[in-house]
Each structure stands twice: as structure tokens, then as C-alpha cells.
Regions:
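Short, small/polar residue-rich loop motifs at catalytic or cofactor-binding pockets
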Residues: 70-73, 101, 311-313
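Active-site helix/loop module of the DD-peptidase/beta-lactamase fold
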Residues: 104, 123-163, 193-227, 231, ...
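N-terminal leader/targeting segments and the immediately adjacent pre-domain N-terminus
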Residues: 5-7, 13-97, 119-127, 158, ...
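Active-site-proximal alpha-helical segments within enzyme catalytic domains
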Residues: 179-186, 229-249, 314-330
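Active-site Gly/Thr loop motif
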Residues: 211, 264-325
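Structured C-terminal helix/loop/strand segments within mature extracytoplasmic catalytic/sensor domains
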Residues: 27-30, 308-355
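Active-site SXXK
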Residues: 59, 82, 89-90, 101-129, ...
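Structural helix-adjacent loops and short alpha-helical linkers that scaffold large soluble proteins
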Residues: 54, 124-129, 187-200, 247-256
């Protein structure tokens, strides 16, 4: 009888020990989930808690994505207070992704081109955004159209040039890849360099971005200004942090602060007049110089953000009020979801930063 009691007690002790181990493991897993490794690429690293972020919410989000319950994303990178705090990758069946994987940004490229225009203005390569762009192409004077002569670089930057339309430039927004390609052509005329070379010398090198690809136009062989840039997710985050810092990286002014402020401020509405009820809605509703501006709602808190956006839910989101940058990359769309990455932002990332 005594031996039986001793055996039962031993089983109880073993069970309690296992529960303790499992609890400790779960706690450790939650605290370590998504914490980046130091790649010696210019990023300081810490846990989410050290930067006042709730790691449990971030891990819940990450696990939901891994289990196929949430949006289809390839990676999420979160930076707060200039420190990389969360980084998680989700390999797909035919696509391996990790911290070294280059990811095409599609139209996020446009926002990088805007930074190049700011650098060109600062260096005196471009003197005036309101000069008609035909002045950059005197060799094509015979192709000028009287109704399009007033188009300026400012019109192109705000997607209001109305190329291929009889509408007056500068009045309303109409998204166009062609307008950003023209911005790239103006940059090449003004600087003598294509956007990829200009970016490497004046933007990527100072940021310590070394692994870069840039898709070329199949006919001209020139780098695509509208949607050709391919970077690591961590490097897309550097672009976001540069903007959050008003053009400064590691104490050096790379892009003029005045340009960053102006280019990420509302220059034109992307929608018509909004009702009082509509104003409460989430998502992008205005445009700067190749940057989107929008908002999210975290319970009663309205959070304004700036974003570079690309096809298939590519987003680099800058949240000044929370001193935070969030990068999403994806290679396939999420079913029945219009903006899956914004859903993740609203349900998990913003609440994680609530305190």
C-alpha cells in the first residue's frame, strides 16, 4: 500500500514538473517569438517589451499567420524607437523567405523615387518643381501637345498630370505608373544618371543597403521607376525609418528634412468629398509626393500613418505618433480581404503599442 502511495506521489510530482516546464517554455516562446537576430546591418536589436510593445499580441498574430488563419504574408518587420524589435518570415510552398530574401516592392518603388527627387532638389540638379517637364526634353519639341504643355514635375509627383486625358493637370488625382516613369526620366535628364545608379550612390550607400536588384524596362533597358525595386524587408524598413527620422540616418542628413516633411504631407485627395461618417473610415485617402497618407482606428484612438504601397499588399508604414515603422511583404493575395496587412496592423500591432 505504501509503495502504491509513493508511486502515485511520484506521478503527481512528475506531472507538476512537466506542467512547469511547459509553462516556462510557453512563456519563453512568447517572449522570444519574432525577436530579430543581429545581422550587423546597421540595426539595433531588442525585444518588443524593451520598446514598450506587447510581444504576446505580436506572437499571436505570427502564429495565426503560420496556421493560415490570418493574412497571407511572406514577412513582417516592426521597428520602434529606431530599434528592430520584431521580424518573422513565413515560407510559402514554392518560395523560401528569410531575413536575406530580396522582396519586390512593386509600387513602393515610387516612394523611393520621391526621395531621389528630394536629393536632386537639395543638390541643385532640379531647381523648380513647377517648370513644365517638356523643358527637360528639348530634343522632343516636335512632339509637344499644347494641352499638355503645362504639366510639371509637381503634377507628376502628385499623380495629377492626367496623361492620356483631356482633363486639366493639377486638379484631381489619377494613379498612373507612367507618371512615375516620367519622374525617373526627368531625374535622368537632370542628373545624367538612371534611378538605380542615383539611388545606389546617394541613398542606399549611406543607409548601408548593399543587396539590391532593380528590374529594367525590357525595351529601353532602363531601371523601372514605378515598380522595379527589390530589397530585403529589413532594408525596406530602413527606408521607412529614414522618413520617420526626417531624412536622417545614423546622424547624417541623407534627404533634406524639408523635403521629407513636404513629400509626406497631403498634397492632393485621392477620393471625393468625405462625409462626417466617412472621415472615421480607415485606410489611405490622400497623397503626397509619391507617398500615401491614411489612418487606422485602434478602439477610440485614431492613428495617422504614411505609407509606401505596392501590388500584393507590399507596404512600408510609418507611424510618427508611435515612433514606429512596419513592413509587410507578400507574394500572393489573401482571399476575401481587401487590405489584409491593414487588418493585422489594426488588430495586433497597434494594440501592442497601446501603452
Amino acid at each position: 500500500m505504501q509503495a502504491r502511495i509513493s508511486f502515485i506521489a511520484s506521478l503527481g510530482f512528475l506531472a507538476l514538473s512537466l506542467i512547469g516546464v511547459q509553462t516556462a517554455f510557453a512563456t519563453e516562446a512568447a517572449s522570444n517569438c519574432g525577436i530579430p537576430s543581429d545581422a550587423h546591418d546597421g540595426w539595433a536589436i531588442s525585444s518588443p517589451e524593451e520598446q514598450a510593445l506587447n510581444s504576446t499580441l505580436l506572437c499571436t498574430m505570427g502564429d495565426g499567420i503560420s496556421e493560415g488563419k490570418l493574412a497571407n504574408v511572406d514577412d513582417i518587420v516592426v521597428v520602434r524607437h529606431g530599434v528592430l524589435v520584431y521580424e518573422r518570415y513565413y515560407p510559402q510552398k514554392q518560395l523560401h523567405t528569410d531575413a536575406t530574401t530580396l522582396h519586390r516592392g512593386y509600387s513602393m518603388t515610387k516612394s523611393v523615387v520621391s526621395l531621389l527627387v528630394g536629393i536632386a532638389v537639395d543638390r541643385g540638379w532640379i531647381n523648380d518643381l513647377d517648370v513644365p517637364i517638356v523643358s527637360y526634353f528639348p530634343e522632343n519639341a516636335d512632339l509637344r501637345m499644347p494641352d499638355k504643355a503645362p504639366i510639371t514635375l509637381r503634377h507628376l509627383l502628385t499623380m495629377s498630370a492626367k496623361l492620356g486625358s483631356s482633363e486639366t493637370p493639377g486638379v484631381s488625382f489619377a494613379y498612373s505608373n507612367g507618371e512615375t516613369e516620367l519622374v525617373g526620366a526627368v531625374l535622368q535628364k537632370a542628373t545624367g544618371k538612371t534611378v538605380d545608379v542615383l539611388a545606389q550612390e546617394n541613398l542606399f550607400a549611406p543607409l548601408g543597403i548593399t543587396d539590391v536588384e532593380w528590374l529594367k524596362d525590357p525595351f529601353s533597358g532602363i531601371a523601372q521607376s514605378a515598380r522595379g525595386l527589390i530589397l530585403r524587408p529589413r532594408d525596406w524598413a530602413k527606408i521607412g525609418q529614414l522618413v520617420l527620422n526626417r531624412g536622417v540616418w545614423e546622424g547624417k542628413q541623407i534627404v533634406p528634412a524639408s523635403w521629407v516633411v513636404k513629400s509626406t504631407a497631403e498634397q492632393i485627395k485621392t477620393e471625393g468629398p468625405r462625409s462626417a461618417e466617412h472621415i472615421k473610415a480607415e485606410g489611405p485617402d490622400s497623397y503626397g509626393y509619391q507617398w500615401w497618407l491614411g489612418r487606422s482606428l485602434d478602439k477610440d484612438r485614431r492613428v495617422e500613418w504614411i505609407a509606401a504601397m505596392g501590388f500584393n499588399s507590399q507596404k512600408t508604414i510609418i507611424i510618427p505618433a508611435l515612433d514606429m515603422v512596419v513592413v509587410f511583404n507578400a507574394s500572393r493575395q489573401s482571399k476575401n480581404m481587401v487590405a489584409p496587412e491593414l487588418d493585422l496592423l489594426d488588430r495586433y500591432i497597434l494594440p501592442a503599442a497601446r501603452n
